[in-house]
A protein has these predicted regions:
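N-terminal glycine-/serine-/threonine-rich phosphate-binding loop
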Residues: 1-39
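Boundary/activation segment at the start of structured domains
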Residues: 4, 23, 51-56, 68
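Alpha-helix termini
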Residues: 24-34, 58-61, 127-135
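Glycine-rich beta-strand-to-loop/alpha-helix junction loops that act as flexible
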Residues: 41-46, 143-145
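A glycine- and small-aliphatic-rich helix-loop capping segment at beta-alpha/alpha-beta transitions
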Residues: 52-63, 87, 147-156
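Ligand-binding beta-strand-loop-alpha-helix segment within the catalytic cores
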Residues: 62-139
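Class I SAM-dependent methyltransferase SAM-binding "motif I" and its flanking Rossmann-like core
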Residues: 140-175
């Protein structure tokens, strides 16, 4: 893992996006040229910075037709709730880029039967992602570091899988690749 310290959070987001797009342009593997790019988002407030920079500065450079978007965590709330990770991504990214509904795979946090939703989402992810052996793998995963107030919560979904490149934007100005 490489640690990069930027002058500010927006510059850290730029570092992450430049790195991701460079990998996508490689001839093959990890979302290389022509491959489907499977990216997973987490929640919290920090991704908004990443999404905003992506839309403002990197949208035209991103091959959106190759992207499939997933989530690795979601709170058990409606997709319209202010605490929904999907809602954050929708407002700051998804409503501003040319993705179709067939490219977006969200966790349905509003489902009353959380266990059933976990099974549905897990099965769908298993059927969509490429495998490393028998384990599904995301090409990129944007992760956050949970605040202490979030740790120990039970009203959320969390999905842990392998990923080829982890993009971590910490509050402040640190990018981990």
């Amino acid at each position: 893992m490489n640690i990069h310290v930027a002058d500010n959070a927006r510059e850290a987001a730029r570092m992450l996006l430049r790195n991701m797009l460079a990998v996508i342009r490689q001839p093959s593997g990890a979302g290389g040229e022509g491959d489907t790019v499977n990216v997973a988002f987490s929640g919290g407030s920090t991704p908004a910075i990443l999404f905003d920079v992506w839309v403002e500065e990197f949208a035209e450079l991103t091959p959106w037709n190759r992207f499939r978007v997933y989530w690795v965590d979601e709170r058990c709330v409606s997709s319209e709730n202010k605490d929904s990770n999907y809602r954050l991504a929708k407002i700051h990214l998804l409503d501003k880029i040319p993705l179709t509904s067939e490219q977006i795979f969200r966790i349905r946090g509003e489902q009353e039967d959380a266990e059933r939703e976990v099974l549905r989402y897990s099965s769908m992810v298993l059927s969509q992602l490429p495998l490393d052996g028998r384990i599904p793998v995301f090409d990129f995963e944007q992760m956050g570091i949970p605040l202490p107030s979030f740790l120990g919560r039970r009203n959320c979904f969390i999905l842990w899988l392998l990923m080829r490149l982890v993009l971590i934007l910490l509050p402040g100005n640190v990018a981990l690749l």
